[in-house]
Amino acid sequence: MSQKPVNDGEIKTEYLQKVAIADDGSWVIGQLFYIHEDGGTWIVRYAPYSKEDRYGGEVVLAHGVDMSNLREGDLAYVRGEIIKESRASKYVGGPLYRASSVTLNERVD
């Protein structure tokens, strides 16, 4: 993966009014981040760190979904389900999320 980190994990200002999660977790709109530890993990961040949220503002994508057309920093629409409510990884605090689809909403610059 030849992508450079986009920032410190905070959502881009222009995305803040566009990110959200369904009450039942069936969809998430968020900014994509990539954690390189443990063979690589994709995070979908849908709330800023400053906002109180039951999942800490992020979900951790379970392996198996095709992310080849997406980049770190993109805004994406993700459909699926939370499959493990507790912390999914020792590196991040969000729950594990099984995505059935990930669609690009906006490409990072």
Regions found by a protein language model. Give the residues of each.
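Conserved RNA-binding domains used in RNP assembly and mRNA/RNA metabolism
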Residues: M1-D109
